Structure formats: C-alpha cells, structure tokens
UniProtKB/Swiss-Prot annotation:
Residues 1-27, 78-101, 163-199, 262-276 are extracellular. PROSITE patterns: G_PROTEIN_RECEP_F1_1 (PS00237), G_PROTEIN_RECEP_F1_2 (PS50262). It is a multi-pass membrane protein. GO terms for biological process: sensory perception of smell; signal transduction. One of its GO terms (cellular component) is plasma membrane. This is Olfactory receptor 52A1. Residues 49-56, 123-141, 221-240, 298-312 are cytoplasmic.
Length: 312
C-alpha cells in the first residue's frame, strides 16, 4: 500500500495497514488471533459468572479478579473486531475520532489492568501480614473506592493524550497508520508538526503508571515473603505462598510482555516493523487469554466451582 506524500488537513478517515509486510498472509494470522480472542472471551465470561453466582467468592480478592476479567474482555474487544475486519474483510478504514476513542480505550484499560494488579497485591499483603485485620480493613466500601480510583486514575491520565492530538495537530503527512490498531505513538507520528510534547507526555504516563505500580507490588511482595518465611510451620508457609502464586504469574506475564514490547519498539530499530506490530498485538491479547487459565489452574476455589458447574 502506497503512502501519500500530500499533507492532509484534519482528516476524517484514517487507514490501518494491519501488519506491514505481512499483508498477503494476514488472513491466516487472523485465525490464531481469533482463537485466542474467543478463548479469552469464554474464559473471562466463565470467571465472571462463577464469581457472581457463588456467594463464597464475594471477597475482595475475587471481586478484584472479576474486575480484571471484565477489563480483559473490554481490552480484547476494543482491538479484535477491527483487527479481524482488516485481516479478513479488507476494511482498513476507521474514522479519525473513532481511532482516537480506540486509542483512549486501549491505553486506559491497560492502566486499569495495572491498577487492579496493585489492588490485588495490597489485598494479599494485608491477608498474609495482618490476617486478623483483613476483614476489617478490606470492607466492601474500600473495595469500591479502590476500584473507582483505579478506573479514574487511568482514564484521567490517558485523556490528555487524546486532547493533545485533537487540539495540537491540524495537518498530517499521511492518513495511513502502519499498525493493526490505533496506538498513541502510531497516530502521533502521522502529524506534520512538532510532536515532542506528545512523546514526552506519553512517556510520562507510561513511567508514572508502571513505575508506581511496579514499585508498590514489589514492596508488597517483599513484605509478604518476609512474613511467609517467618512462619514456623512448613505447611503454613506453603499455604500462604500458594495464595499468591496465581497473582505472581499474572503480574509477571503482564509486565514482562509490556517491557519486552516497549524496549523492542524503542530500541529495536534493526528489527522488522512487522515484528513490532505482532508483539504489540500479542502483548494486548495474551493477558486476557492467560489470566482466566492461570487463575482457574492455580486457585482451588475457582477450580472447584468450574468442575461443579460442568458436572451439574
């Protein structure tokens, strides 16, 4: 697909290439992507159904897990329908405002997911380090407040990215986005203007969210491990640590994929563009796909209720 050199004033429609360099095989790439999406939808919907129907799971940890499942459904659904439209039906066009909205949803939902992982780490910290006070500290009201703060933090931090693009840029070098979805820097690079402010703010948001969340989760688990290793009985240590395994797995895969995608994009100039696009797409789809599988396999209560549901 050729890219026009004509400067465009306030374009109403943009074009998503998909995966640059792999246009001829995108229809085949769409098959595993669609399978991952369907499994993610089924797994997270099942998780939400179990948590909602079982009163014994109406605890902070599982409420946060339900929030994570809902976020995963929203995140996967914000990119896959359009991506499959590009891969299978050759519908690359997207309205400019719709593209900005998709960008805002994607980055906001990523921020929400990171915030939920912080909330889950805090819950595990209180449950293990202060078990007798857990029920008094993590009240239903506090859970609602934490959930609201997580959503508002992400939405408010990402909103200026949208405003800066809409208000600062009027002329664009091209209307063709070399990506499979509307990502912040992919849109910013189209502008025929100084994009330094947008780049700086984008990095500020990324490092603010990731920096705070990673620090908080790491400190929480340092305290958790200190408390666990001080327990006198081996069985008690194993039981306490076992309640954290699922969260640790989800936390590691979320941030490892995020950092791998970030550093290959920023510093992997020798890497082919289609590798960048593939990894950035996989980074958004793999967590929604893996999270319900990890919690289903590692959390006894969830596993029991899944078996009970299918047996009945």
């Amino acid at each position: 697909m050729s890219i026009s050199n004509i400067t465009v004033y306030m374009p109403s429609v943009l074009t998503l290439v998909g995966i640059p360099g792999l246009e001829s095989v995108q229809c085949w790439i769409g098959i595993p992507f669609c399978a991952i999406y369907l499994i993610a939808m089924i797994g997270n919907s099942l998780l939400l159904s179990i948590i909602k129907s079982e009163r014994s799971l109406h605890e902070p940890l599982y409420i946060f897990l339900g929030m994570l499942g809902a976020t995963d459904i929203a995140l996967a659904s914000s990119i896959m329908p359009k991506m499959l439209g590009i891969f299978w039906f050759n519908v690359p066009e997207i309205y400019f405002d719709s593209c900005l909205l998709q960008m805002w949803f994607i980055h906001t939902l990523q921020g929400i997911e990171s915030g939920i992982l912080v909330a889950m780490a805090l819950d595990r910290y209180v449950a293990i380090c202060y078990p007798l006070r857990h029920a008094n500290i993590f009240t239903h009201q506090l859970v609602i407040q934490i959930g609201t703060m997580v959503v508002l933090r992400a939405a408010i931090l990402v909103a200026p990215c949208l405003v800066l693009i809409k208000c600062r840029f009027q002329f664009y070098h091209t209307t063709v986005i070399s990506h499979s979805y509307c990502e912040h820097m992919a849109i910013v690079k189209l502008a025929a203007a100084n994009v330094q402010v947008n780049k700086i703010y984008g990095l500020f948001v990324a490092f603010t969210v990731a920096g705070f969340d990673l620090t908080f989760i790491t400190l929480s688990y340092i305290q958790i491990f200190i408390t666990v290793f001080r327990l006198p009985q081996k069985e008690a240590r194993f039981k306490a640590f076992n309640t954290c395994i699922a969260h640790i797995c989800v936390f590691l895969q979320f941030y490892l994929l995020a950092f791998f995608s970030f550093f290959t994009h920023r510093f992997g100039s020798h890497i082919s563009p289609y590798i960048h696009i593939l990894f950035s797409s996989i980074y958004l789809l793999v967590p929604p796909f893996l999270n319900p599988l990890v919690y289903g396999a590692k959390t006894t209560q969830i596993r029991i209720h899944v078996v009970k549901m299918f047996c009945s």
